[in-house]
Amino acid sequence: MFLKAVVLTLALVAVAGARAEVSADQVATVMWDYFSQLSNNAKEAVEHLQKSELTQQLNALFQDKLGEVNTYAGDLQKKLVPFATELHERLAKDSEKLKEEIGKELEELRARLLPHANEVSQKIGDNLRELQQRLEPYADQLRTQVSTQAEQLRRQLTPYAQRMERVLRENADSLQASLRPHADELKAKIDQNVEELKGRLTPYADEFKVKIDQTVEELRRSLAPYAQDTQEKLNHQLEGLTFQMKKNAEELKARISASAEELRQRLAPLAEDVRGNLRGNTEGLQKSLAELGGHLDQQVEEFRRRVEPYGENFNKALVQQMEQLRQKLGPHAGDVEGHLSFLEKDLRDKVNSFFSTFKEKESQDKTLSLPELEQQQEQQQEQQQEQVQMLAPLES
């Protein structure tokens, strides 16, 4: 079934937003991945897809948010699903129309740049090399920081395992009272260190976005002399490039955060296992503590190996996108699917607008409800005063 194809997307979204409200970016990501998968499927397969599948995916975002005292998530879900379904149905029509418009735009832009094809290609190549030079230090720093933070995390947690083994040897008669505080402290230390790790790694994505803005602006200036009467079309193409590159930066941040949360979820059961064995026999506890240090090292090392290449992979993706721009603007572009990034940008803009409007209305509704609450309080006070006045003659 097609839903299996988006399990990874939903899992990443769920981990990244497990402690926060459902966001516009999460909703747009689910919608875009769903649309992309439909576009990539054979027509026969698409015809068999149930229209309810998008609704199921969106509802999955809310499954952990419903049932709370705050009704925000429930109200948002009721209004969002119909909006998203209608917006998705329009995407296919908008896609064909936009593809035609972007195709014409690129034709005019290529025709204008054709007399300067070699110079344009050279400028983009120069800009590409400058981009690589700017990003390489940050990718190296990210790799180093991942290794440093992983080692620091290991150094922070390993002593707890060693300390609990020592306490086990010295306090065999009162294990629960002696070890429980250490097991609780280990769990708290895991949470604290994972949050610190995320705080040190995720800002690199923002640094990358700053460099993207600088690079694209320099490219705009270098190509401007060759596109004097088609500057607006060139700007539009560069906006699409910027969107793609910054999307990669946001995905990098989300992947780092999701990997850190996955590390937390892998480490937490180790502390819980120790706490659970406190109620069992000494032999089981000894085995659990003996294996704890090795398990901690293993999970931290797996995190390091998985996350270290993120920076280099991000750089490669940006280089590829810059090369695609050079191909689109070149004389031998062929049939390039250049409209999809603009379609996705439009989708995300519409979803962001929906969320902004919804939150503004929610805020207005809360503001309007305050006078009603005050009026109810005044009525209650008047009723209490009337009751006191009615009782006064009886007391006399």
Curated annotation (Swiss-Prot):
Sequence repeat placement: 33-54, 60-81, 82-103, 115-136, 137-158, 159-180, 181-202, 203-224, 225-246, 247-268, 269-286, 287-308, 309-330
Presence of keyword Disulfide bond: no
Signal peptide residue numbers: 1-20
Post-translational modification: Phosphorylation sites are present in the extracellular medium.
InterPro entries: ApoA_E, Apolipoprotein_A1/A4/E
Cited PANTHER family: APOLIPOPROTEIN, APOLIPOPROTEIN A-IV
Name of the protein this chain belongs to: Apolipoprotein A-IV
